[in-house]
Amino acid sequence: MSTRLLSVDDLTVQFGGLTALSHVSIEVHPGEVVGLIGPNGAGKTTLFNSICGLVPIASGTLTLNDVTVSWPKPHELVDLNISRTLQGVGLFPDLSVMENVKVGAQKYSKSSLLRSVFAFDKKDEKDLEERATKALERVYASSLGNQQADSLPYPVQKRIAIARALVSNPRLLLLDEPAGGLGHQDIEWMNSLIKNLKVETSILLVEHHMDVVMNVCDRIYVLNFGEVIAHGTPNEVRNLSLIHI
């Protein structure tokens, strides 16, 4: 069995006549945090969305938890032991924190989610409750389950969004700008949270805050113009003359 949770091999993505990603290869191994950085338009979000099955792949392969696919579908991520957060929070404001977290256990498309948020099998309800409780504990929000999501401060909502992604017990967690919109103190708190999460769950993150990337990542891939132009540890990347951090 492979030691890689994620392997992106020679991936190319095209939109019309534009090549958004060109022959990109990255890996994520158990027990590590891997960062994707680069300027706006470098291809970070496109790569992230390709892994999540949100954009079609022109060529190359993705191996997710030992399953090789040409183009994963978003609803298949749970079966592949992968989960993700969205930019911002994406919580349902009229639902409680606990209800929002439970939604993360659903295997859904956008339409099916809106039609039936809580179409859970009754026999699984106890297990779901336990997993949602554990997910909230992992983000230090176990006392907030009954509160309305939109009543919480934005930094706390970010934690709830991560808990929702954790409820399916993923081996690999994809974090889309976890520090986005946070102040300095909350960014430090997020750094600590990510380090604690990687004990049980490997992480691939896209992030513009370099203090987060340098603090929490074991390895970093630098993208520009749709290509990986550098790869290494935080110290190795920091010392590259082409990277101004």
Residue ranges and their predicted role:
Residues I37-P39:
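The feature captures the beta-strand-to-loop junction immediately N-terminal to the Walker
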Residues V213-N215:
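A short, surface-exposed alpha-helical micro-motif characterized by mixed small hydrophobic
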Residues S112-D150, S192:
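Conserved ABC ATPase "signature" region
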